[in-house]
Amino acid sequence: MLDFIFDYSESGRWKKPFAAHDVGTYPLANGQTYQGDMPVEETGNMLIMTTAIAIADGNADYAAKHWEILTAWSNYLAEVGMDPENQLCTEDFAGHLAHNANLSAKAIMAIAGYGRLAEMLNKPKEAKKFTEMAKRMAIEWERRADDGDHYRLAFDMPGTWSQKYNFVWDKVLGLDILPDRIMKKEVAFYLKNQNKYGLPLDNRFTWGKTDDTVWSATMADSEGDFQELIRPIWKYVNETPSRIPLGDWYETLNADYINFRARSVVGGVFMKSLDHYLRNKRK
């Protein structure tokens, strides 16, 4: 899946300094068709997934083939990722949002991932620079996002909250960038703010996303807390009145399907399995 995005950028057909959202509409891979860019979102995705491949393979050979563009993308995130401008993230149905704390979290994880790749490729200077950068950004993120017993939806929006599921990669990839207290505080807040059929994405709506919530649940320290966050999703899947292939965007109050069905994002519900798999790989 990553090959096509790499080729699109490396060939010069994609001119922007961040990763493309797509390469076309099936069956034609003749250029991005999505109308709104997701600069930090997609650039972060490419770096994080390349890091995951390296850890799964036990080497960074794949990353080495694309090092020039990975470096360019990492520098881009270093410049704009701490406090993203008004742009879309993967929840594009919720619209644009500036200073998005969860999007910033993705940038931090991606920069840390690049640091890990550099370490695996015996590039100590780059490894030290980007790993330390990610750690500084994490501390700054905590300062800007702190809202008492949780962290904000956006840095400039006190009294708000959102799932920070992008931080799951610190645990899954073994990056060790975040202070432990960040995930602990977030998960404790999630457990107190669930609805009958799951945890809303943020305070603006009562919508839920199956894949995102499993990522958030995977951040939990204990199996009990993980199960507590998963149980309402199981209830949604079993009790939804919408008899369709699994809908990943749904209403947490009544289990009604909102939109999206049988999509590839359902693969995200296997995050806990990926966590176990990569944890064993790192031993």
Q: PLM features: residue spans?
A:
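Alpha-helix capping and helix-loop boundary segments enriched in small/acidic/polar residues
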Residues: 33-41, 57-68, 84-105, 121-129, ...
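Extended ligand-binding clefts on enzyme/binding-domain cores
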Residues: 6-31, 35-41, 100-108, 135-231, ...
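Beta-strand segments within the central parallel beta-sheet cores of soluble alpha/beta enzyme folds
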Residues: 2, 64-71, 126-136, 185-188
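Aromatic-rich carbohydrate-recognition surfaces in CAZymes
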Residues: 1-82, 100-114, 118
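A sequence-level detector of short, solvent-exposed, charge-rich linear segments
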Residues: 20, 89, 96, 126, ...
